[in-house]
Amino acid sequence: MKLGIVIFPSKMIQDKANGLRKRYDPHYALVPPHITLKTPFETQDEQLESIVNELHTIASKTNPFALHVGKVGSFAPVNNVLYFKVEKTPELTFLNEEMHSGFFTQEREYAFVPHLTIGQGLSDAEHADVLGRLRMKDFYYEQPIDRFHLLYQLENGTWTVHETFRLGKGNN
């Protein structure tokens, strides 16, 4: 089974991101807008209970925090991906590090850059055009975060929530 670990922003932020994703992200229908804490990984069904237990432990060691989303960025020239930048708080860094050490040890493909994808798979020309237009707009959103989610991928490629983990002691 294929799993991923994410934070879902508020409906207002998701609506703003989806307004752009409809036009610029071919994965729009597969998963709601999110901040990836751990990229998708394959695991055996028998490991699911251990994964869930470890995520409860990580969540209990992490306090709720404020998520700051703003400005448009890009991973070009590595990838023609457009995103809303997410401020790299100590809590986000801690969550990401915990999900790449100990029980979850696995090689990282990229350094951790918290973001909310709004476009991908664009041609170089389209990417440059859209990035230029979006960088002129002023985006800034802030919201409290008190949970993250373990997702699994269905056979049709869509992602759905398996379990939600509330941050802070005594919440799980």
From Swiss-Prot:
- List, from the UniProt record, the residues annotated as the active site of this protein: 34, 115
Keywords linked to the UniProt accession: Hydrolase
Q: Which residues cross the membrane?
A: none
Query: Motif (HXTX 2) spans which residues?
Result: 115-118
Q: Which InterPro entries match?
A: 2H_phosphoesterase_YjcG-like, Cyclic_Pdiesterase, YjcG
For molecular function, the Gene Ontology terms on record are: hydrolase activity, acting on ester bonds
User: What residue intervals hold the motif HXTX 1?
Assistant: 34-37
Gene3D superfamilies reported in the protein's UniProt record = Cyclic phosphodiesterase
Q: What is its EC number?
A: 3.1.-.-
Q: Name one Pfam family in it.
A: 2_5_RNA_ligase2
Q: Which family does it belong to?
A: Belongs to the 2H phosphoesterase superfamily. YjcG family.
Record-given protein name: Putative phosphoesterase BCE_1348
